[in-house]
Regions:
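Left-handed beta-helix
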Residues: 185-196, 210-418
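Unchanged
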Residues: 1-267, 354-355, 390-403, 407-409, ...
């Protein structure tokens, strides 16, 4: 699923959809579900898209090529007007409903439905194997989470066989949440211990038997979590697949910021360095990163960057990034650039007083996200410290969820202090 407008990730989604947002220096969010599919032996993939999709389409088309003699594909299914439908997708279920006609042209018994804005590594073969073994009509991947965090997720109660007996989307009532808490017997079966009550949270990952999906969508329901799943409860066999590995829903600026910075830890919970289950992305053929006279502590730096005489502490730096002399970056996610500036362009921009792409000399930047192609002049100071958690500032700078964000292509003049 390509996702909706991504308003909670704004301004990162101002010019792109959520799955196209850069991740971990060189990837995009959409690479995660596609790579999980490919590593699980699933290579017939439909990507349903709608808002700000140009960069997503370009990335997928440039990245996922299959040989002419195989049956694998990643097909982009953009929202379209037809004789039957004249408007946009109205939700996750509606998006799938409108594309079922395309699924039918490929032989299949099961349909796996995924979100495009999550970070995790999962072997979907295990989910499908459990789905078959239990005789399930629908299997929902679920993760144990503290009851204090369940209000923003779908919650389910299961019996000893993991059959779902109760489901609530984003429950608020304390009594309802308490009724959804995992039983001591189920807690004892898990490998991850807990000091408090937990609920099983829906990960937004579904396996449907083919006929059941068609029946479930033979109506006007728009959303899987809010409508379709509750409507099937008691009528079909719904089971949970419990996943105890690392999983994060990157739905907000804060979640995106923290998920990226977590990758800079010495031993991150999500490991991009697993050769057996790699995360695939576009091969850009960039040169190695050049680092000159720098102090670097816990950082991830993308290909083709030039980092000179500066300090990086707990940072994720993207491709083609330029960080210049005397600058200090701490707790910063910098997405890099789509291009290099030529010598002629650098001279022309300097004559016009336009800062070069990247971070200038003598800057001090903390707690920030710097989107692609931003131009930050010399002596700029940026930090969300001491400011409200949400606010608007000069040069299109925003603070969202306590994180300062420099939007894509923004120009921050020399000496600016925010």
């Amino acid at each position: 699923m390509g996702g909706g407008r991504g308003t909670r990730l704004y301004p990162l989604t101002k010019e792109r959809c959520k799955p196209a947002v850069p991740l971990a220096g060189k990837y995009r969010l959409v690479d995660i579900p596609i790579s999980n599919c490919l590593n699980s032996g699933i290579n017939r993939i439909f990507l349903l898209t709608q808002f700000n999709t140009a960069s997503l389409h370009r990335h997928v088309q440039n990245t996922y090529h299959f040989d002419s003699f195989g049956q694998g594909f990643v097909d982009i299914m953009a929202a379209e007007q037809t004789e039957k439908y004249a408007d946009w997708y109205q939700g996750t279920a509606d998006a799938v409903r409108r594309n079922v006609v395309h699924f039918r042209t490929h032989p299949h018994d099961y349909v796996l439905i995924l979100s495009g804005d999550q970070l995790y590594r999962m072997d979907f073969r295990k989910v499908i194997a459990q789905h078959i073994a239990t005789g399930a009509d629908v299997t929902i991947a679920a993760q144990p989470v503290p009851v204090s965090k369940i209000e923003d997720l779908g919650a389910m109660r299961v019996d000893d066989n993991l059959e779902i007996k109760q489901f609530a989307e984003k429950p608020k009532d304390a009594a309802l949440i308490d009724s959804l808490a995992m039983s001591p017997a189920l807690e004892a079966r898990l490998t991850t211990g807990s000091t408090g009550k937990r609920c099983l949270a829906s990960m937004g990952i579904y396996v449907f038997s083919r006929g059941v999906l068609q029946q479930a969508l033979d109506n006007s329901m728009r959303d899987f979590g809010k409508e379709v799943i509750p409507s099937l409860l008691g009528r079909k066999r719904l089971f949970a697949y419990i996943f105890e590995g690392y999983w994060v829903d990157i739905g907000t600026v804060r979640a995106f910021f923290e998920a990226n910075l977590a990758l800079a830890e010495p031993v991150p919970r999500f490991n991009f360095y697993m050769h057996t289950t790699p995360i695939y992305t576009h091969a850009r053929f960039l040169p190695a990163t050049k680092i000159n006279r720098c102090t670097i502590d816990n950082a991830v730096i993308g290909d083709g960057s030039i980092i000179t005489d500066c300090t990086l502490k707990h940072c994720v730096i993207g491709i083609r990034a330029m960080v210049r002399d005397g600058s200090h970056l701490e707790d910063v996610v910098m997405m890099g650039a789509d291009f290099y500036e030529s010598e002629e362009e650098l001279k022309e921009h300097a004559a016009r007083g336009l800062p070069s792409v990247g971070v200038g000399r003598g800057c001090n930047i903390r707690g920030s996200i710097i989107d692609k192609n931003a131009r930050i002049g010399d002596g700029v100071v940026l930090s969300p410290e001491g400011k409200p958690p949400n606010g608007e500032y000069p040069y299109d700078v925003l603070i969202r969820d306590g994180v300062l964000v420099v939007p894509k292509g923004a120009v921050i003049p020399p000496g600016t202090k925010i």
